Amino acid sequence: PLQLTDLPFIYREPGSATRRAMEEFIHAQGWSVRKRMELTSNEAVKQAVIAGLGCSVMPLIGIKKELADGDLKIIPVKGLPVTTSWNLIWLQGKQFSPAAAAYLQHLRSSKHTVIGNRFRWMESYFNQASP
């Protein structure tokens, strides 16, 4: 039977956080994969996968519609999904406008609610990995 490592892989460009997460995952699995191409955006990678040019590791947030529409599917693999942390950053000493300060306060006070409302749909994909 066809193995995942037999498929060509589509990568993001060097320096991309998506590529770094993908390479760390592949290395942790001990896989040797064939790189088919490198593209400069998650959208380009997604469209290449939809076109049948290979497979990839992608952020769930970028493929929500395609998963719902059935255009893409997730292959359950132990170790996936890879989780990463994001941070809100700004220039040190920056004076915020009143609107920016209010938005930052909203994010700080409501982050768990915002995350729950916007990203809860992802939870169904976190337990799909094969044993």
Give, region by region, the residue ranges found by the protein language model.
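Residue-level preference for short coil/turn positions at secondary-structure junctions
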Residues: 5-6, 49, 82-84
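Flexible hinge/capping segments at coil-to-helix
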Residues: 1-9, 14
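Residue-level signature of the cytosolic catalytic core of signaling kinases
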Residues: 14, 18, 37, 92-96
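Hydrophobic hinge/microswitch elements
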Residues: 20-74
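C-terminal effector-binding regulatory domain of bacterial HTH transcription factors
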Residues: 28, 60-69, 79-131
